[in-house]
Amino acid sequence: MAEEQDKDSKTEAPSEKKISDATEKGNVPFSREVTAFASTLAIYIFVVFFLSDGAANMAEALKDIFEQPEAWRLDTATDAVALISHVVLKCAALVLPVFILLILFGVGSSIFQNLPRPVLDRIQPKWNRVSPAAGFKRIYGVQGLVEFGKSLFKIIVVSIVVVLVLWNDYFATLDMMFSDPVTIFTTMISDLKQIIIVVLFATATLAIVDLFWTRHHWYTELRMTRQEVKDELKQSQGDPIVKSRLRSMQRDRARKRMISSVPRATLIIANPTHYAVALRYVREESDAPVVVAMGKDLVALKIREIAEKNGIPVFEDPPLARSMFAQVSVDSVIPPVFYKAVAELIHRVYAAQPQQRRVT
């Protein structure tokens, strides 16, 4: 009951940090059915392209042993080793391709789902992995029921397919008892192909469904409560590095927003290279000029550059520029102490427009 209530309280989507932490610990969505489909596909490729020739060679080898037993004397240990080595080599030549295919397709299916990464946490011993209580929850929980349903589905499908194939080839199956080894292997391969094709389609369907369900279940398990979101936010904002990064980002955004306001300015008051203050005055908007941008050094040069591109008058008055830079702030009206000096500059702007764009 407590576990259900805990899940119900997890109403928030997992944060990037929660997902990143889970990934670092090896907690990633992984569908075993995709691997099962890849293995089935590997076996089908083996049966179609390798098994026929391999089985024929194997049958011929066994045929020689059974039809010409006198050629294989077992008088000494050396004779026995020679016979066993012959059979083992023939068997190895037959099964080696399927092992290679299974490994390649198995690794490929894992990489398809998640890129490989070393995770020490997964190989460290933990009590909950051998705990009976934890095992009981895994078996009888939602995940356990889903796994049971998938296993039951595969057993039913394989059983039905095997019965139908053998029933369809009932007489051919009976005739195998009286056939030569080559015919027996050929018939078995034909039946095996039919079985694997149907199983391949079944596992493909199951793999697609399970792939989406596994990712959905993994995402749901990572969901967070509102309190967890608040705690994580406090923790991240409390980190000095994160705070510094946030302040830097905020300054960058404010600077970009301020620079974008320069074309709206009425005039620029500047110290030749160190300070620049952009003022906007429209009688219908405010009773006094408003500071739309200000900066020093490189920012001041940028303000002047934009102003000159937009035909905004630039007045070089070092004492006034320094004094205003120290006492005004962006998006606020200028203090009354500057009214007279700024009013004279605005009057010069109105008198000179549009002929004069820069006054020294």
Curated annotation (Swiss-Prot):
Residue ranges, annotated region (Disordered): 1-22
Protein name per its UniProtKB record: Flagellar biosynthetic protein FlhB
Task of the protein: Required for formation of the rod structure in the basal body of the flagellar apparatus. Together with FliI and FliH, may constitute the export apparatus of flagellin.
Organism: Rhizobium meliloti (strain 1021)
Gene that encodes the chain: flhB
InterPro entries listed in its UniProt record: FlhB (IPR006136), T3SS_substrate_exporter (IPR006135), T3SS_substrate_exporter_C (IPR029025)
Keyword Cell inner membrane in record: yes
Localization (cell): Cell inner membrane
Biased segments, Basic and acidic residues type: 7-22
